[in-house]
Amino acid sequence: MIKLKDLLFEGHNDTDDSGGVLYICYDKALLCLGADSGIWNIPKGHIMIGEKPLEGSVREFTEETQISLSGIPELANSYKKDNGGTFYLYVLKGTKKFTPRLDHEHTDWGYYGKEELPDPIDDWVKEVIENEDIAPELIS
């Protein structure tokens, strides 16, 4: 039987769940270009053991952009991943255009409106941005 403390000490402190924050400022979404994947996406990552999905999603956003969010992101959607975990997507609408300081996981960033999304972009993120029920401020 595997104990929680053994998982933590072996470096396995992530769950199968993950989450991210879609930050929207003046009808534009903050997106980052993945260093390994070469795909535009939102700042996201694994949720650690003991974290709530919102906590993990905000932590990942801050780690990957060096931006401290002022506001509480709202859960916009979630889906089951192939590994059995759940991905949680949060949205935060703000009026401040932050300049992220990227970490090793990203090579570029930008704010993009619905009609100017970069390519290649994660299919699910693109769908979420284009879905007026989830991100109405991005609708032209």
Which functions belong to the PLM regions below?
Residues 4-11:
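Proteolytic processing junctions in secreted/extracellular precursors
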Residues 6, 20-22, 28-31, 74-75, ...:
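A generic structural signal for ordered secondary structure
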Residues 11-42:
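N-terminal strand-loop-strand
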Residues 45-135, 139-140:
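Unchanged
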